[in-house]
């Protein structure tokens, strides 16, 4: 078996919103990489032994005292270094160059970079030719400060009209700096530049592939758990589903999946999960029908945060009860993925700044005394999906729109009742079915229906009816940090509204949410 971690890149994070994107692009190239905070120690870098180092961007100014710096060892480690935006500026400053604050000459957005001289980083890459006959690149800039003098041993490789050192290089030491962001799609040839750095300059092979990742994960699970039994909370979501499939491949019958039906799932979702994992794939599943228990606990509660906590608490209680029945289980599996690890500062270095605590299963009791198995903890979400496909999970399940952990508990506004959930399930199923039929489902990033606890007068035949209101919500987004409401065709919305009102007895009005994020959030609660 080839060692998928043999070749690896270290990315040092200075706080840019794009840093995780760099890691994802390098992984897409087929090379393993890890993301660490900028204040990592020399010993930690030596232990990781990267083939190359990327200094990522950041929001601060190199010209200010106490702004972050790369560890000096980065430039003494004997491996290639690529500085991106702030990373280029701190590289320049630390190696004897000069950085000045941009006054009235900030570059944000598209820019054209003219290549001045040959470099291993940009070789054979161009988007056009300048009037002077030089290669031109279309890139994405986002900087105020700029390098005004490059360090000794470096040459200016490319420039823009306002930035004389858009790319700099020391080919002997294999140090490179780019003022733009090659990791974003707006830089048209950005992925090729990263390929040049990772494959050609750092000498990495593309060993990081779905089939190899699965093989490695299976072997690691076997080595970790030995002959022991493992339990897993299976929700039917992407992460827990792929975790279940990896564990099943590794240890077979020694995996017990606990599927808790909280009564807050989508239409027929529990049935589909049980049929797919139990009947089709042959996993050992304990099915707990806990709808009444969850609804009883939620009775009378209107506050969204309180509802989330109740749902999490009841899940933990039930899971704990079921886990205690698995007397031979020594391990608890979780679908923790790499962004969770980064956010929780749970990486091997312990150096990432804590953003939020992450509890994949809602914070399981400390006294469970089970070891933790997290086979996805090195993977980004897009990698988890690719592995799921390789393991035989259906595309539609892996690429389904996001669904909140508390489920319909936060899509029924206010108090959660069975009647409301049943109406919402049917209305939402119609909306999603019509999106698929109109080939719109994959053109929006997320779509769902919200139940509003208000009644509205309607007319049905010769009579009046006084029934509930639902809102349709569809958004377009790249990262879910910001989002635009989706401009779905009027005739499509009309068709969905007519179907819901005619087919779901109890709903008299359908509205469409046209709020962006910000100021609104994507979910209503």
Swiss-Prot record:
Keywords: ATP-binding, Glutamine amidotransferase, GMP biosynthesis, Ligase, Nucleotide-binding, Purine biosynthesis
Coiled-coil annotated residue ranges, if any: none
Catalytic activity as recorded in UniProt: XMP + L-glutamine + ATP + H2O = GMP + L-glutamate + AMP + diphosphate + 2 H(+)
UniProt keyword Ligase present: yes
Subunit and partners: Homodimer.
Chain residues that bind ATP: 235-241
Protein name: GMP synthase [glutamine-hydrolyzing]
HAMAP family xrefs: GMP_synthase
Signal sequence, start to end: none
Function (record text): Catalyzes the synthesis of GMP from XMP.
Domain Glutamine amidotransferase type-1: 8-207
Superkingdom assignment: Bacteria
GO MF term set: ATP binding; GMP synthase activity
Keyword hit for Transcription regulation: no
Gene designation per UniProt: guaA
PANTHER family: GMP SYNTHASE [GLUTAMINE-HYDROLYZING], GMP SYNTHASE-RELATED
Enzyme class: ligase
One Pfam family matching this protein: GATase
């Amino acid at each position: 078996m080839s060692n998928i971690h043999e070749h690896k890149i270290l990315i040092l994070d200075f706080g840019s919103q794009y840093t995780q994107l760099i890691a994802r692009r390098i992984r897409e190239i087929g090379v393993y990489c890890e993301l660490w905070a900028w204040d990592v120690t020399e010993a930690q870098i030596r232990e990781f032994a990267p083939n190359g180092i990327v200094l990522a961007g950041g929001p601060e100014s190199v010209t200010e005292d106490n702004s972050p710096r790369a560890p000096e060892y980065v430039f003494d480690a004997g491996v290639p270094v690529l500085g991106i935006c702030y990373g280029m500026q701190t590289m320049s400053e630390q190696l004897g160059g000069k950085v000045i604050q941009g006054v009235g000459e900030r570059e944000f957005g598209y820019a054209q970079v003219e290549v001045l001289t040959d470099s291993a980083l940009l070789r054979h890459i161009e988007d056009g030719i300048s009037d002077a006959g030089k290669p031109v690149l279309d890139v994405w800039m986002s900087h105020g400060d700029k390098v005004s003098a490059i360090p000794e041993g470096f040459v200016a490789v490319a420039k823009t009209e306002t930035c004389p050192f858009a790319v700099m290089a020391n080919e002997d030491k294999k140090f490179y700096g780019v003022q733009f962001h090659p990791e974003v799609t707006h830089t048209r040839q950005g992925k090729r530049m990263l390929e040049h750095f990772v494959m050609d300059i750092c000498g990495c092979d593309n060993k990081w592939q779905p089939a190899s990742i699965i093989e490695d994960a299976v072997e690691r699970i076997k080595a970790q758990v030995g002959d022991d039994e493992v339990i897993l909370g299976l929700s039917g979501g992407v992460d827990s589903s792929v975790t279940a499939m990896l564990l099943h491949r590794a240890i077979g019958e020694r995996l017990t999946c606990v599927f808790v039906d909280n009564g807050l799932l989508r239409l027929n979702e529990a049935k589909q999960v049980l049929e797919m994992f139990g009947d089709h794939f042959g996993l050992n599943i304990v099915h707990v029908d806990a709808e009444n228990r969850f609804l009883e606990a939620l009775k009378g509660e209107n506050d969204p945060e309180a509802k989330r906590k109740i749902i999490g608490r009841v899940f933990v209680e039930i899971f704990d009860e079921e886990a205690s029945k698995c007397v031979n289980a020594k391990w608890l599996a979780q679908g923790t993925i790499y962004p969770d690890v980064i956010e929780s500062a749970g990486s091997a270095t312990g150096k990432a700044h804590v953003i939020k605590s992450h509890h994949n299963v809602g914070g399981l009791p400390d006294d469970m005394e089970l070891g933790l198995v997290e086979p996805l903890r090195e993977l980004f979400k897009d990698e988890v999906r690719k592995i799921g496909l390789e393991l035989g999970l259906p595309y539609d399940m892996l690429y389904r729109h996001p669904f909140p952990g508390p489920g319909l508990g936060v899509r029924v506004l206010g108090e959660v009742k069975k009647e409301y959930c049943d109406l919402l399930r049917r209305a939402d199923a119609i909306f999603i079915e019509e999106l698929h039929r109109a080939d719109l489902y994959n053109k929006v990033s997320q779509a769902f229906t919200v139940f509003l606890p208000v009644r509205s007068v309607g007319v049905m035949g010769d009579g009046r009816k006084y029934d509930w209101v639902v809102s349709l919500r569809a958004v377009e987004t790249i990262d879910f940090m910001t989002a635009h409401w989706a401009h779905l065709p009027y005739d499509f919305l009309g068709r969905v509204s007519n179907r819901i009102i005619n087919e779901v007895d109890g709903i008299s009005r359908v509205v469409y949410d046209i709020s962006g994020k910000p100021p609104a959030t994507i979910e209503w609660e």
